[in-house]
Structures are given as C-alpha cells and as structure tokens.
C-alpha cells in the first residue's frame, strides 16, 4: 500500500443494506429530479396564492405602538417560482423549484436583506449519514445572490425533496396558565403556519419530513421546527440535526479585526427551547453557532 494506490488480492468487501459501487472521485451522489406529477401539483397550489412583487415595501407604522396591520400571509412571487411568508414586518422567501430553499430573509422595518447566499433548510444525520433538507447547489459566488442564478442551480445529492405544502392558522403550542398578577390577558396567538412536506432519497423511501414555519401577527418573529415520519417498517436513528443553516450577510467588514469575537453579529435574535445557565442570551443559548462559511472566499477576513 503506497499513497492512493493499492493492490488487493482476493479482497472481500462487506457491507450493510446498500451495495457499494465504484464512482469518480468528484461524485457527490445521484441527483433526483422533481417528478412531473409533483411539479404540476405544486404549481397548481402555488397558483392559487395571492401574487406580490419583490422586494416588499417597508411598513409605514411602528409595530411597537400600532401593529394591527401586521397580518401574516402567504403569497407567490416570480411567476410562481417562489412562496413568500410575510406579515409586513419580516418576510421569508422560499424557492420551490427544483427543490425547497430559503433565498431571502428580509427585515422590512429596516430594509435589510439578511442573507448573502443560498444554503439548505437543515441537515439530518440518520444512521451515521448526513442528508440535506432541501437546498440548492451551484451558486457561483457566495458574497451575494442574484435571482437569475437560482434558475441554474440544482438540488443537493441525496437530499430530501419537497413534494407538497399546506397553509394553516397558528395554534397554541403550550397551555399557558395566566396568573392573577399578569397584566396581559390570556389570548391565543394568531398568524400563519406554512408546512412543507419533504420525502427522502431512494435509500430512505418511506421517510418524510415536515418542516414547519410559523409567522405571528404583529410580531417580527418566525418559529421553525420539524417532524420525521418513518413508514419504512424499519428502525432509523436520528443521530443529530441542524435545524437552520443560513448564510447571513455580515453587518460590517472590519479588515483590521482578525478575531471573530470582534465582529458584529447580524441583526437577528435567535432563541430555542434549550436555554441554560443564567439565561443571559449570549451564554445561555447553546444551540446557536456563528461559524465561518468555507464557501465565502471573496472576503479578506
């Protein structure tokens, strides 16, 4: 055995479930295209949504003083290629074809476009193997995004693919018990919940993932969670997951600062159910990580 060359005599390869095969070094896996039936069904459902033009306008009111106009709705845009979830304060734009991917998150109150590049909707590690939840690959530059690039991008290999979506009203997720000293009267939250249904690649036939996005009325707040449905008849193990993977635009470019701790974070606040220690946000949230993007090579630091 020397370097990357080996001579094997009477070699025997053992494997589990999936038979190994020889492929080129750059092979990333088979890319499955969206079926015509699924494409027609999605186009028909998207065509029933109200159409908006992007970018959306900024609100003319201060939501902290008067937020009655901030109603969550689901729209279509870009000739039915995109689904837009917005309440007039924030918006999230999803490209649906050829696979689900968030292409923009906008703070409509400030006019900020929060994303500089397209990624995926998360990563599941099932039985030791990583699978992308939706996502588009092939972006030529990761410092910014042009909409014309999206039409040439392709799904990630071995990724979960969108096959359906539904829109519903937000329902209470916990039974909150109001106290006598609480000034706020108990009321149910209102808004829209957008749920995408994704199916696994061929090796995970029967495994589906529901991605839920809830946008509240009157609040610049989006909630996200997922469910896994296993109808394969066999056990699968969820080793780990990444619920959100966003290529955020940096709020500043300090060429002198070389330590990541010196960089300003994007203008976004992230919360999860996993809060620990003294519940001070910057140290309590152990699920939020700001990491370098190896794809982003056009920035000096």
Features from the language model and the residues they span:
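Gly-Asp-aromatic-enriched flexible segments
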Residues: 1-49
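N-terminal accessory beta-strand-rich subdomains and adjacent acidic, glycine-rich linkers
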Residues: 49-301
């Amino acid at each position: 055995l020397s370097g990357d060359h080996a001579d094997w005599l009477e070699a025997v390869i053992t494997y589990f479930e999936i038979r190994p095969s020889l492929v080129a070094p750059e092979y990333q896996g088979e890319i499955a295209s969206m079926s015509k039936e699924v494409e027609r069904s999605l186009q028909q459902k998207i065509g029933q949504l109200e159409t908006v033009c992007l970018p959306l306008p900024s609100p003319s009111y201060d939501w902290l003083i008067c937020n009655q106009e901030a109603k969550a709705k689901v729209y279509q845009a870009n000739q039915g290629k995109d689904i837009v979830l917005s309440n007039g304060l924030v918006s999230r734009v999803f490209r649906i074809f050829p696979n689900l991917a968030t292409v923009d998150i906008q703070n409509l109150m400030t006019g900020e476009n929060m994303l500089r590049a397209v990624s995926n909707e998360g990563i599941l590690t099932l039985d030791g193997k990583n699978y992308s939840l939706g996502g588009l690959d092939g972006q030529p530059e990761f410092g910014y995004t042009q909409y014309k690039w999206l039409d040439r991008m392709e799904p990630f290999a071995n990724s979960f693919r969108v096959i359906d979506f539904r829109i519903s009203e937000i329902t209470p997720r916990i039974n909150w018990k109001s106290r006598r000293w609480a000034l706020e009267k108990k009321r149910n939250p209102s808004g829209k919940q957008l749920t995408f249904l994704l199916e696994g690649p061929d090796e995970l036939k029967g495994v589906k993932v529901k991605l839920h996005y809830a946008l509240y009325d009157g609040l610049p707040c989006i909630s996200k969670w997922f469910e896994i449905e296993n109808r394969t008849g066999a056990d699968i193990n969820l080793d780990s997951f990444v619920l959100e993977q966003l290529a955020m635009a940096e709020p500043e470019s300090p060429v002198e600062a070389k330590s990541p701790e010196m960089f300003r974070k994007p203008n976004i606040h992230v919360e999860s159910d996993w809060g620990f220690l003294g519940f001070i946000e910057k140290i309590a949230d152990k699920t939020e990580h700001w990491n370098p993007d190896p794809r982003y090579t056009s920035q000096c630091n």
